[in-house]
């Protein structure tokens, strides 16, 4: 990623590209955001509704647990009714993997080592190949193989990486290369070290995450430290923020991490002050309201909400639209970094929403025009 501010540049690790349904993973593809449903998969209606909420939040890929035959039986309806590729989460039962592939799963999350015999692994790979499924090798510090625990004494980076490479070799021995790898741990130090080590010894796309990260607040902090560290170093091709919360919350946090590092852009990025006695309006309440009112906008743009003139004008220089608290019940509105007009306090929120929606519409039109112009330039001459 290039920038005229070199301190903002992140050079991503070069990796092979695979596909999870229509979503490319690895190579120069955008870093995709994932989540996992926490409904009973057999309750297809509830699972579909949850996935649709995650879609509205911006999810790219959704994982669904398939612990039994009834779950894989429900998978076909789920796949049919949603707009994002579905990863079937499989453990131990190789037949569930085959059934999930037949039901339309775009990817199978397995550990080849716990599927069973070489013949069973061969059957799973055959089903994946026939149905266009990729595979995710999911190594976890909490379920490492016995021989690795005996060798290393405890889950450590070497053990996680060795497990991942052993499983990768199983797939490669079957001439199957459409796979990605994860080496997750709940300990941030362990997870980051394992991913860094794995990134140095292979070019497979990496699914990054801090597993069992915790509650919404604690898990967000933990994941931001771990995933932010990896992404800043260029490691990671797809990601999931694991929270004990609704799946759409995981998606929103994932997007915020990517937006903070300039790796992807979606929706309105609000820059706001923590507020103090100098604030000309209630900053905290205003930001909360605007986040809700502007959640439907997907066009990337920036909005600064600053309570006073100490930092307000400076922040507005770097945003598409800005508001700075003033006196006498009126506040200054900035457009493209310049003072533009004032707005009465009692109509400020409605006014900002209107400005942002209009700006988003202009940006969408400009993007569409640029795309049409580029396509016309590539079209053969008549």
UniProtKB/Swiss-Prot annotation:
Catalyzed reactions per annotation: (2E)-4-hydroxy-3-methylbut-2-enyl diphosphate + oxidized [flavodoxin] + H2O + 2 H(+) = 2-C-methyl-D-erythritol 2,4-cyclic diphosphate + reduced [flavodoxin]
Essential cofactor(s): [4Fe-4S] cluster
Record text on cofactor binding: Binds 1 [4Fe-4S] cluster.
GO BP term, pick one: terpenoid biosynthetic process
Alphabetized UniProt keyword annotations: 4Fe-4S, Iron, Iron-sulfur, Isoprene biosynthesis, Metal-binding, Oxidoreductase
Function recorded in the entry: Converts 2C-methyl-D-erythritol 2,4-cyclodiphosphate (ME-2,4cPP) into 1-hydroxy-2-methyl-2-(E)-butenyl 4-diphosphate.
Name of protein: 4-hydroxy-3-methylbut-2-en-1-yl diphosphate synthase (flavodoxin)
